[in-house]
Regions:
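Glycine-rich cofactor/substrate-binding loops
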Residues: 28-53, 93-97, 114, 296-382
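Short amphipathic alpha-helical segments with heptad-repeat character
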Residues: 138-149, 156, 186-189, 193, ...
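Short, Lys/Arg-enriched N-terminal segments with co-localized hydrophobic residues
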Residues: 13-14, 20-31
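Extreme N-terminal basic, low-complexity initiation segments
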Residues: 2-10
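Generic, well-ordered alpha-helical scaffold segments in large soluble proteins
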Residues: 64, 107, 111, 154, ...
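Acidic, glycine-rich loop-and-beta core segments that form the ion-binding/anion-interacting portion
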Residues: 226, 232-319
Length: 382
């Protein structure tokens, strides 16, 4: 028999573990560490917003069903008025069900009451989760497009500033022919312009919805519901689907982000090379009080550009993972889910951070025209 003191001890231990896990779950904002997370993008990928987007899909489906007479209109109104969720409560239920969407629906039902029987009618989990993730990818792309457009303008402004600043062009790392520093920056601007077009296309590719039920046959839901929900949420219904939206879309999205990250790394690497002591034709802004080394106080290191180079490697790795997700068993499996929970937030948070960071670097970039002229003379004017 369990002694009286032992029971109380075990009860306290269990309660402490559950409370700690609840706290960790509530505090979990994104997979990317806070150091590289900007607030707007971080909120977009928060647990709270993910469930809110899923709820938006469910409510839009109920509204559409009510409009078509498939559920009572009063029920749809009641669902929209009362439907809410609690992140802690969802996690508490999930610890029993081991199914996040069922946990979510159970929590919503606790708030809605009798009319909750109409929520999720004819749908499968992937209908709401895939559609919600597509909205989040679309919104993330909008943030990144805004970042890139601002970066493009900074590059154009500085390209004009240095349009008459001669410097030596280098091929194979060796002096080649004279050019202008403005031309170098204009080249970067042109590549960012292409990246903007790529992201716009990637945004369109993932701006889709799927509400066709298990294995995508519409066996328990009218195809009109999908059309109506898509219109409400600003998404296009996919032409064909299995139980999931096909992952070539997600792969193209993540791969596009990796290409843009590589463009940023290309620019950052050039700044790093130009900042080398041997060249020092340009360098990152060094703020008052900034230090370069704990052992060598003379150091002025291109740490921000180095950070961008490192983070580009992460996104290229994420692109490989996204392509691995294209292959699923038969009409679906769930092997993609654990990958996407990490790479979709990480990739977009990473790119948002790096684009903003590099925009600031180029905006404040210190350029030394006299050193450029000096270096041109090292080859005797050839």
């Amino acid at each position: 028999p369990v002694r009286e003191g032992q029971f109380e001890f075990f009860r306290r231990v269990f309660t402490s573990v559950v409370q700690r896990r609840h706290q960790e779950y509530e505090e979990e904002i994104t997979k990317m560490i806070e150091r590289y997370t900007n607030p707007e993008m971080g909120h977009l990928w928060s647990i709270e917003n993910e469930w809110q987007q899923i709820l938006n899909v469910e409510m839009a489906a109920c509204d559409a069903m009510a409009e078509l007479g498939e559920i009572p209109k009063e029920a749809a109104k009641n669902i929209r008025a009362k439907a809410k969720f609690d992140v802690k409560r969802i996690h508490e239920i999930e610890m029993v069900t081991h199914h996040d969407i069922i946990a979510f629906l159970t929590n919503v039902a606790e708030n809605v009451g009798e009319d909750s029987k109409y929520v999720h009618k004819g749908l499968t989990s992937s209908d709401v989760k895939d559609t919600a993730y597509c909205m989040m990818m679309r919104d993330a792309a909008e943030i990144i497009l805004d970042d890139l457009r601002k970066f493009r303008e900074v590059l154009r402004r500085r390209a004009v500033e240095f349009k008459h600043t001669p410097c030596i062009g280098r091929t194979h790392g060796i002096h080649a022919e004279p050019m202008t520093f403005g031309l170098k920056m204009l080249l970067w601007s042109a590549e960012i312009e292409r990246d903007i077009e790529r992201v716009e296309h990637a945004k369109e590719i993932v701006s889709v919805c799927k509400l066709s039920g298990a294995v995508g046959t519409y066996s328990n839901i009218d195809p009109k519901i999908e059309q109506m929900v898509g219109k409400t949420l600003g998404l296009k219904p996919v032409r064909l689907a299995t139980q999931v939206i096909q992952r070539d879309r997600h792969a193209e999205f993540v791969t596009t982000m990796a290409i843009v990250s590589s463009t940023l790394e290309k620019i950052a690497t050039e700044v790093r090379n130009l900042q080398r002591t041997d060249i020092r034709e340009a360098e990152e802004y060094f703020s008052p009080g900034q230090k370069g080394s704990s052992a060598m106080p003379h150091k002025r290191n291109p740490i921000n550009c180095e950070r961008i180079s490192g983070m580009a490697r992460l996104n290229r790795g994420n692109a490989v993972a996204a392509m691995e997700d294209i292959t699923l068993w038969h009409e679906r499996d769930i092997s993609h889910s654990s990958v996407e929970r990490v790479i979709l937030p990480d990739t977009t948070i990473n790119l948002d951070y790096c684009t903003k960071k590099l925009t600031n670097i180029i905006d404040k970039l210190l350029v030394y025209p006299e050193k450029m002229l000096h270096d041109m003379g090292r080859t005797g004017g050839l």
